[in-house]
Amino acid sequence: MAEEQQAHLEDLNDQMLVRREKMEALREEGIDPFGKRFDRTHNSAELHEQYDNHTKEELSEMNTEVSVAGRMMTKRGKGKAGFAHLQDREGQIQIYVRKDQVGDEAYELFKHADLGDFFGVTGQVMKTNTGEVTVKAQTITLLTKALRPLPDKYHGLTNVEQRYRQRYLDLISNKESFDRFMKRSQIISEIRRYLDGNGYVEVETPVLHNEAGGAAARPFITHHNALDMDLYLRIALELHLKRLIVGGMEKVYEIGRVFRNEGIDTTHNPEFTMLEAYTAYTDYQDVMDLTEGIIRNAAEKVLGTTDITYDGQAVDLGSPFKRLHMVDAVKEQTGVDFWQEMTIEEARALAKEHNVEITDAMTVGHIINEFFETFVEDTLQQPTFIYGHPVAVSPLAKKNPEDGRFTDRFELFIIGKEFANAFTELNDPIDQRERFEEQEKEREQGNDEAHGVDEDFIEALEYGLPPTGGLGIGIDRLVMLLTDAQSIRDVLLFPTMR
């Protein structure tokens, strides 16, 4: 153990060694370098809100005592007085420390403090000659000694990967990043508030599943030792939530982590946060209204506006979202009319003619979807509901009563990316079994995103699922949109890293 400790010390740079020497010196003086609780009367925002509008003379007359605490981010001064800025969650507050006010011992503590140390200060609110609200210290208390120096205050963390791996440093040194994560929390709170206010019940469903289902995705597999059985981390929330509609809960939602064993890029992380909501006695058109309401409300409440900018592109979340059938969208962009009945050979010929990559296992429905993804998706900059997906790519959606080739399903696209997926739920257990069996055949042919028959779910449907509208929204992508973040890693506190 002593050898390991010695090796660790040898790895430290000069600044770190000096800080450790200061820590030991504090201990020798009977001062705990890692402090204890401290009672604050104000955070920085409250202090500025209450006192910014007062003059220097008014504050001197008021002689108000406050207690503040935070991480020391700047320090200047020499001789018998100095200034510093303490940073808390809301921002920064300046402190003014004089030797003749705090005493020799406390002033020495301040004088030898390093940036990054935590302090608690009690004193009077004043204003400097430059008009900055400041706490003139009567007492100053070391709360935590930082043993490592912070990133350079002018350059911050320039290494993007380090920002993701050491998010705590990113939060300390990058206000934009800190504010984004505060907004993320507010966005999720507003989504909850909106759904709760509309009569939805928040529930929690299992993360470990016997059968992966509810989405076309490759799952993570784990093993339960006591039961000696493989289990899957959930790839969607859907199938358990629909069981609750069968059980009579009528309006339910869950915001939770979902796991997919797939690639990582600017919009995909192996674990991410989903909102799924299910409403009895509704259909996919009602769910369009719900989706619009959730997103518009989050923008209004958190940003104060529905006119936002993403990557330089203006996006209008306040106007009614456009609604367009997938086949019409493909026809607009390519001239190809998939409303016409056609054989698989004819569809393959069209794909070849338009350089659309397909596989032998694809049906006409799959090919329509490939046309959409190739030619249409990137063009959808303003909020657009694309509805009428083919049955082949929608195993859990109800068939359209007028045209059984398509489903009552929609996806919401903004800035060329998918933000929501929803449909009138398939509530016919016979049809559901057939679709599961089709999926099982696809899996046997090598499609590792297709899944088998979920007997327990079918049994639940046989007890009766009322007509139901279901919705899934990727929370991380929505936060990206509302905070103008270019990568999903910028909205995940601790993204998956190699």
Swiss-Prot record:
**Reaction equations catalysed:** tRNA(Lys) + L-lysine + ATP = L-lysyl-tRNA(Lys) + AMP + diphosphate
EC number(s) per UniProt?
6.1.1.6
Q: What does the entry give for GO biological process?
A: lysyl-tRNA aminoacylation
Question: Where does the source fall among the domains of life?
Answer: Bacteria
* Residues holding Mg(2+) 2: E418
Principal place of residence: cytoplasm
What cofactor does this chain's UniProt record say it requires? Mg(2+)
What HAMAP family does the annotation carry? Lys_tRNA_synth_class2
The annotated subunit structure for this chain is: Homodimer.
Protein name, UniProt field: Lysine--tRNA ligase
Q: Could you tell me which species this protein originates from?
A: Enterococcus faecalis (strain ATCC 700802 / V583)
Which lineage?
Bacteria, Bacillati, Bacillota, Bacilli, Lactobacillales
